[in-house]
Amino acid sequence: MQTVKMYSTLVCPYCVHAKTLLKKRGVERIEDIRVDLDPAQRASMMALTGRRTVPQIFIGETHVGGCDELVARDQRGALMPLLNGAQG
């Protein structure tokens, strides 16, 4: 399974929803980068994604986007192939 990295904050309901979905799909470990604790990480996230909002999710080297994009990818059947190593 691909590595999953998520930029998040503690109180973000979309972050919680995204983590729950990923765990339901078999992801055992999510590298959780808390941008509320480290302003440098928020700046890094914005430089990588061009976005200010959380969550920002990476599966392997693929930037999935936020929670809505993750859910949409799952609904169209494209999340599991990406988690299992397909290019996204």
Give the positions of each predicted feature.
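Non-catalytic, surface beta->alpha helical segment in thiol-disulfide oxidoreductase systems
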Residues: 59-86
